[in-house]
A protein has these predicted regions:
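Membrane-interfacial entry segments at the cytosolic side of transmembrane helices
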Residues: 3-5, 257-259, 304-323, 412, ...
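Alpha-helical transmembrane segments
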Residues: 6-18, 267, 321-327
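Extracytoplasmic
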Residues: 8-91, 463-835
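Helix-to-loop transition at the C-terminal end of transmembrane segments
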Residues: 19-36, 96-107, 332-345, 487-489
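Transmembrane-lumen/periplasm boundary regions of multi-pass, lipid-linked membrane glycan transferases
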Residues: 41-42, 53-66, 72, 76-90, ...
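Active-site lumenal/periplasmic loops and adjacent helix-entry segments of GT-C-fold
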Residues: 69, 73-197, 206-213, 217-238
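Membrane-embedded helix bundles of polyisoprenyl
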Residues: 134-136, 181-200, 205-254, 258-294, ...
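Hydrophobic/aromatic-rich transmembrane helices and adjacent perimembrane loops
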Residues: 281, 426, 430-464, 468
């Protein structure tokens, strides 16, 4: 009884602590402190100005003391007014992230798309906009035709069903608010399951520590707070349940019970395939664990005595049955889609960090920040603490060695330790491929930490001094976890804000319903759900050829090339390439040919294509490239693109000729490849130069050879001319009459590589020879204000810079349509004039 009461109390404490920090985005308590600081500074400024007038002849030290006393006196006498000012300021700060009803926006972009699918399930019974030939179709993605909805629908159906059930209790609550708080329900279920699993293995205190460690880990806390409507919590819940039930199947004695647990484990894994595309990772872990177990039985026969052969047969039958049942349940819940995607997914995981994957297209996933490579220090930052990570990993290894040497760990403990060890090793490898996978280390590390505490207390239970030290360490762990969670929770804000919402609402209100929005994939889900308009790219379709083409539009200096690519995309996505390639039968050559066609007029393009395409395909390709799109189209640029420009430019600068040569070298067919691309009209000297470079470059350095990253070196700065000089806060000095610029760096004035000046609709460049900095400066004037920023020279004339900073001045195909800004941060939408 006392154990049950302790379990309830500790579980309640875990839930309360976890809920408290996950509710921060509801009311943003961190902004209350910021509001107090702003009001206090305003009071100080006001009183300081008064003192400078009334006591201007006072000594500075006296003024400082007078200011301090006056502020204190004012705050004591006007606390009621100050409190109102703080509340007003606090409301202004947090309302930036909330709609007109005070409801915080969803946290990340994927959640907007999932909420749209969930609303469709609630209203129509299925997530797509329409059903075509039995397939769910989302009409707003992959414009102009639309695309198939992702195959994993469990989140949408579960959330819609729960909302329907909740509506019987409260029918007035909008589904959007219900979905905002949905992560709390998922977290509660996950922590309950985690606690019960740990309780069955390591007791109450160990379960408490494990759940606190996992629940408050920075990577998990930030991805499971209110407003984070995604599958992240379910992606931990299902593997934990599958593992628990599978371990039960291994350790129960009754054959019927064993089959029952096996059935439940397989069914949950099948349901997991209906939840997340990478469901198979836990199946792979279990298979590797079983291979290890079978090898151990064979190599350590004395450990299992006469049961070895029988155990070998039982385990072989069990794992075979598990795999067969799982595959059947996967097919039952998700159909053929997971099997079709499985090979490509495994191949994709192996090449996550490689831009160059011997493919015609660059690997977009390698540019996504959460899929970057990690080291132990970064893993520790995402999980919480380097010492705790090292201790947890070390203890898993120690437990694993004990299972090999001691019969003390036979049965459930041996199986649990073995599976956790395999899980940890597999996820450490996965973490080396992408930071996102760090979250899947939490379960084995958390259980290991709780297990360590339980084992240590059991071993030293008769030593009063050591027991007290352990209790103090336990208190320190709880306090440090809470402190860390508070720090992380304060940094959680939605990526959506009122500026973005205003732009998207204006798009919805002022564009035709069949309009297409062209922009980077980061904004696709917002445009689709809030503006309700078609998009070329979004977060779920980022790793497709259209991403390369869009990146090319942003960084090209040639407006004619940009509009040609946009025509092609808005007419048929990547279909023009597909038509050419089915005639040429060489994707590299097809791309080189297509890029050549995009740079010429229709008549020249016709002559080029006539040599390679049939008449019908030639006409179809020309219509896609040169035909006027049937839908109105708009182009969006935003301030957040400045930070990701290295990734965008790397994709856009992808050199297919270099890739073609490298691929041919791998296939030992370099001579034939050179002959092919020469036939396509590629400069022979350039090919010869590339071939010589390729012979000198290592395989692991190829991605740095086939492309290059461009970036902005500073934020946009604003200033005015005074005495013939413009001083910017970034250290730049500009002399308008001389048209020269200097940057104060390392106690000396240095010139940029070149100076770009935009005036009278013309973007001119002044090149500074000799020893200069390795970047350029762009300066332009609006009214009496001068604006400046530092950037790579190759970016200065790009379409992105011309649109974002110069508002499309001097361009003929992009007409300003909508603009919103926060200080010097802009979101601009342009109407594309196809004429």
């Amino acid at each position: 009884m006392r154990r049950n009461i302790a379990a309830i109390c500790l579980l309640s404490a875990v839930l309360i602590i976890n809920f408290y920090f996950r509710l921060f985005p509801t009311y943003f308590p961190q902004l209350k402190k910021e509001a107090r600081g702003i009001v206090h500074k305003e009071i100080q400024k006001k009183i300081k100005n008064e003192i400078n007038i009334t006591s201007s002849d006072f000594n500075p030290l006296a003024k400082k003391q007078l200011l301090k006393r006056s502020v204190l006196k004012y705050e004591r006498g006007n606390w009621s007014k100050i409190k109102k000012d703080i509340d007003r300021q606090y409301f202004e700060l947090k309302s930036k992230y909330q709609d007109q009803n005070g409801q915080t926006y969803l946290m990340e972009t994927d959640g907007w798309r999932w909420s749209g699918y969930t609303e469709n399930v609630y209203r129509f019974g299925y997530p797509g906009d329409t059903i075509v030939n039995g397939k769910q179709i989302d009409g707003l993605i992959l414009a102009p035709k639309g695309g198939e909805v992702v195959s994993y629908h469990f989140l949408f159906y579960l959330s819609a069903w729960l909302y329907k059930a909740f509506s019987y209790v409260n029918s007035s609550l909008p589904i959007s608010i219900f979905l905002f708080y949905m992560p709390l329900f998922f977290v509660a279920v996950f922590l309950l399951v985690m606690y019960l699993f740990c309780l069955s293995r390591i007791g109450n205190l160990g379960a408490f520590i494990s759940c606190l460690f996992v629940g408050l880990a920075p990577i998990f806390l930030s991805r499971s707070c209110v407003g984070w409507f995604d599958t992240d919590v379910l992606n931990l819940l299902f593997p934990l349940l599958v593992t628990w039930f599978y371990l039960n199947a291994l350790t129960v004695k009754s054959p019927k019970a064993r089959l029952g647990w096996l059935f439940l484990s397989s069914m949950l894994l099948g349901l997991f395939s209906f939840t997340w595309g990478y469901w198979w990772f836990i199946l792979l872990i279990i298979i590797i664990f079983e291979i290890y177990s079978l090898v151990k039985i064979v190599l350590l026969p004395a450990r299992y005595e006469a049961r070895g052969v029988t155990l070998l047969k039982q385990r072989g039958f069990l794992v075979a049955s598990f795999v067969i049942l799982t595959l059947q349940f996967v097919f039952l819940f998700s159909g053929e889609a997971p099997f079709k995607a499985l090979f490509l997914q495994i191949k994709g995981v192996m090449s996550l960090n490689s831009i160059f994957v011997v493919s015609v297209w660059p690997n977009v996933l390698a540019t996504v920040s959460e899929l970057r490579k990690t080291n132990l220090n970064e893993i520790s930052d995402l999980i919480g603490s380097l010492p705790l990570v090292v201790v947890s990993l070390s203890f898993i290894f120690v437990l694993f060695l004990r299972t090999l040497r001691s019969k003390k760990y036979l049965g459930p403990q041996e199986e649990t330790i073995g599976l956790l060890f395999v899980w940890s090793v597999c996820m450490l490898y996965a973490c080396s491929k992408g930071a996102r996978f760090t979250m899947f280390l939490l379960i084995p590390l958390g259980i290991s930490l709780g297990w360590l505490l339980t084992e240590t207390l059991r071993f030293y239970k008769k030593n009063f001094l050591i027991t007290q030290v352990i209790r103090l360490l336990l208190i320190a762990f709880v306090l440090s976890s809470v402190y860390q969670a508070n720090r992380v929770a304060k940094e959680i804000f939605p990526s959506m804000n009122n500026t973005w919402h205003n732009v998207l609402t204006k798009i919805k209100d002022n564009t035709p319903k069949n309009a297409i929005l062209n922009s980077w994939w980061d904004y696709g889900d917002w445009i689709k759900i809030v503006a309700q308009r078609k998009v070329i790219l979004d977060g779920q379709t980022q790793n497709i050829p259209q991403t390369y083409w869009m990146a090319n539009v942003f960084i090209t200096e040639n407006e004619e090339e940009a509009i040609a690519i946009l025509r092609m995309l808005n007419n048929g996505g990547n279909k023009a390439f597909e038509i050419i390639d089915r005639n040429v039968h060489d994707p590299f050559a097809s791309l080189i040919l297509l890029k050549k066609v995009l740079l010429v007029d229709k008549e020249k393009a016709k002559n080029i294509l006539s040599e390679y395409l049939s008449q019908a395909d030639q006409e179809a390709a020309l219509e896609l490239i040169f035909g006027k799109p049937s839908s109105k189209a708009y182009f969006l640029v935003a301030y957040s693109m400045l930070q990701i420009m290295p990734s965008i430019s790397f994709l856009g600068n992808w050199d297919f000729i270099k890739v073609y040569l490298a691929s041919a070298l791998d296939n030992k067919d370099n001579g034939r490849s050179i002959e092919c691309i020469e036939k396509l009209g590629v400069n022979k000297k350039q090919i010869k130069k590339f071939s010589k470079e390729l012979a000198l470059i290592r395989r692991e350095d190829l991605s740095g050879w086939v492309s290059s990253k461009l970036s902005f070196k500073s934020k946009l700065s604003k200033s005015q001319e005074k005495d013939g000089i413009v001083l910017f806060d970034n250290g730049l000095i500009y002399l308008p009459k001389e048209k020269s610029a200097y940057l104060y760096i390392n106690n000396s004035y240095q010139r940029p590589k070149s100076l770009f000046i935009f005036e009278q609709g013309i973007l001119g460049e002044i090149v500074y020879p000799g020893d200069t900095l390795d970047f350029s400066t762009l300066i332009f004037k609006i009214g009496q204000d001068y604006y400046a920023l530092m950037l790579d020279r190759e970016l200065a004339r790009s379409i992105f810079v011309r649109l974002y900073f110069l508002n499309g001045a001097g361009l003929k195909y992009f007409k300003p349509f909508i603009q919103e800004q926060e200080g010097l941060k802009y979101i601009r939408v342009f109407e594309i004039d196809w004429k």
